[in-house]
Amino acid sequence: MKVKTSLSTLILILFLTGCKVDLYTGISQKEGNEMLALLRQEGLSADKEPDKDGKIKLLVEESDVAQAIDILKRKGYPHESFSTLQDVFPKDGLISSPIEELARLNYAKAQEISRTLSEIDGVLVARVHVVLPEEQNNKGKKGVAASASVFIKHAADIQFDTYIPQIKQLVNNSIEGLAYDRISVILVPSVDVRQSSHLPRNTSILSIQVSEESKGHLIGLLSLLILLLPVTNLAQYFWLQRKK
């Protein structure tokens, strides 16, 4: 009886220590798969499960939550959710002035451009800010011309300087009345460098982080402990019987 109780307790402990918790919920299939692949490449034990509305959720070992969030954050995950034209111009929205309508339209365009730029390989964060021209005042003086600023944070191991003309052209063609020379692009490389393939990988066994080379040794040690547990219980049982 004691042996069975001890084994049941051990199995329960091992089961609880190996449980996974939600890391992110309500993410798209595409982004979820990218995040899952990234976590596994970094040596973390991660899984995905179906979520509401066709979305998925990511699960990791509870002890890996902080590390997983840090890894994904440094790689720009999860991506920002950008507004669409439908969000900016709801069907039941109130009537706005022409200036307000133009401002909302350009904001929606800036959001769409940011979304497009974020799809480029290596882009971690993309922002587009548009400044609208002022109306002509009563004295007949012209206001400041429209301008746009593009901010891109990218992976440090990718050169983005050659993309600047294409980025400016994309913004120029998307915003009406915006001159090419009134567009500025700021590129900021991330301090994080992509992990090289020759670096050692870690894996998680029962919430214990070990290298791939040490995984077999840990499994062997745990197996030995499981085998020794009933042996020690039997030895204790026979010793108590002899004392009686």
Swiss-Prot record:
Membrane-protein topology: Lipid-anchor
User: What Gene3D superfamilies has UniProt attached to this entry?
Assistant: 3.30.300.30, Hypothetical protein rpa1041
Species per Swiss-Prot/TrEMBL record: Yersinia pseudotuberculosis serotype I (strain IP32953)
The family line of this record is:
Belongs to the YscJ lipoprotein family.
Give the signal peptide range. 1-18
| Induction section of the entry | At 37 degrees Celsius in the absence of calcium.
Q: Which domain of life is it from?
A: Bacteria
Q: Which GO terms describe its cellular component?
A: cell outer membrane
Lipidation residue positions, type N-palmitoyl cysteine: C19
Keyword Transport applies: yes
Q: Where in the cell is it found?
A: Cell outer membrane
Which GO BP terms sit in this record? protein secretion
Question: Keyword set for this entry?
Answer: Cell outer membrane, Lipoprotein, Membrane, Palmitate, Plasmid, Protein transport, Signal, Transmembrane, Transmembrane helix, Transport, Virulence
Q: What is this protein called?
A: Yop proteins translocation lipoprotein J
Q: Which residues cross the membrane?
A: 218-238
